[in-house]
Amino acid sequence: MTVLLDRPMWPAHGTLWSHLVSDATLQELHDFAARAGVPRRSFDIDHYDVPQERYDELVAAGALPVTNRELVTRLAASGLRVRQRDRR
């Protein structure tokens, strides 16, 4: 059970964003986010969007830095991934 964080590479609102996910349960993800002070409004169906300025802080709090590819692979393997086409 691990909370994963990809590199900030997703541009929006004048900054770059990372995705914070769990490879086990959404509860693990929500618990980690709450302890780290990530607002619940940052949750987007299967991940939290976090701005680049929080990256180092979240890694220090225990999030495992991974590539985007590894994040998606592990999220899908966990059964927690919600594909873009299924978000409607």
Roles of regions detected by a PLM:
Residues 18-46, 60:
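A short, structured beta-strand/loop element
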Residues 45-87:
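Short, compact, well-ordered microdomains
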Residues 1-29:
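The feature represents the first ordered module of a protein
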Residues 2-3, 12, 24, 42, ...:
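Extended, non-core accessory segments
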